[in-house]
Amino acid sequence: MSVLTSLLLRGLTGSARRLPVPRAKVHSMPPEEELGIMEKAIGLTFCFVSLFLPAGWILSHLEDYKRPE
């Protein structure tokens, strides 16, 4: 049974193995100007605040969300 299954699977996947995979033709150029230290710091601060501030607020007010029994 396993020999038959392996032959069947090999027959199904054999044709797929021979198909050429097209390469993506993506080209990009280097940035026109580098980001400065201040721009990087502002971006990282914004990401930190937008992700962790709401989570911290929810965790600090977790008791308010519990249903009274």
Swiss-Prot record:
Residue ranges that the Swiss-Prot or TrEMBL entry lists as coiled coil: none
Domain of life (superkingdom): Eukaryota
UniProt xrefs under Pfam families: COX8
This protein's pathway: Energy metabolism; oxidative phosphorylation
A single Gene Ontology CC term: mitochondrial inner membrane
UniProt keyword annotation of Oxidoreductase present: no
FT transit peptide: 1-25
GO terms of biological process kind: mitochondrial electron transport, cytochrome c to oxygen
UniProt subcellular location: Mitochondrion inner membrane
Family label: Belongs to the cytochrome c oxidase VIII family.
Protein name (database record): Cytochrome c oxidase subunit 8A, mitochondrial
Taxonomic lineage from the root: Eukaryota, Metazoa, Chordata, Craniata, Vertebrata
